[in-house]
């Protein structure tokens, strides 16, 4: 397929308080995209921003009919924003990228070129080869998370993988068919399969503004990823319970034998309290793990929508073909 073949490319951009960096992002894309010689559609998703992000999106919409925006009634999270963007995107190729310019717009050319030259490919993803500019502990934690996921999850999650990718319509339709409320897009992209080629690039620092992701949020997001794509925590709970039971039986046997042979029972409140606290800690750990999985089931049974729209540009409702209905 030639690069000049006319097709629609939808670019989905989740936004949360991106007032400072959004003009730089939009200008960078507008300067590059005409060279693609293809029809472009922007789908900006305002995830309940409290700054001037929505006003900027409205201004871009007035200037450019290719710009569409969706504004949530509150902050529902990046996963909901990605899902909404995928639902409303109409392109033959769909791009997901962040507005902070850490996803280099110039890579769109290479992505499309790879797909055009390899008709058997369904998706071009991206991976960061370095994390320069990030705090050491945050970078170390990210590397540890990916290594852990590769060990405990049946789904292959490449180290450093980003949400930044270009997908064919077939991949998007497959992702939209997954209707769970608790979403972890990196895992979902991998779970649906399809042939994916990864482009590597070094870390790019945020160009303006501040990230909305704190370390605490990233930590709990990683927990969501582990819970959603692995039963390993349940195995840990089972093994911990089995081990504590074995140790308790062993200690009981030791106390009984010592009493029968030496004639004096083992004394000492310190050792007794240590054992009680240890077993209590194991119990609380396992209850917490079970509770986390049960809470996931509870949230799914509510069948609440992933997001609510406060306002949007004159985007048509997503077509019946792509509309996901809950059973």
What residues fall within each predicted segment?
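Structured catalytic core of nucleotide-sugar glycosyltransferases
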Residues: 1-133
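Hydrophobic helical membrane-anchoring modules
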Residues: 2-8, 131, 184-327
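Short conserved micro-motifs on helix faces and helix-strand junctions that flank
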Residues: 14, 72-74, 119, 165, ...
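Amphipathic alpha-helical segments that mediate coupling or scaffolding at interfaces
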Residues: 14, 32, 60, 72, ...
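Residue-level signature of catalytic and energy-coupling elements of molecular machines
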Residues: 29, 85, 100, 148, ...
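Generic structural signal for secondary-structure transition and capping sites
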Residues: 31-34, 94, 120, 153, ...
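Acceptor/aglycone-binding surface of glycosyltransferases and processive sugar-polymer synthases
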Residues: 66, 72-74, 78-88, 105-188, ...
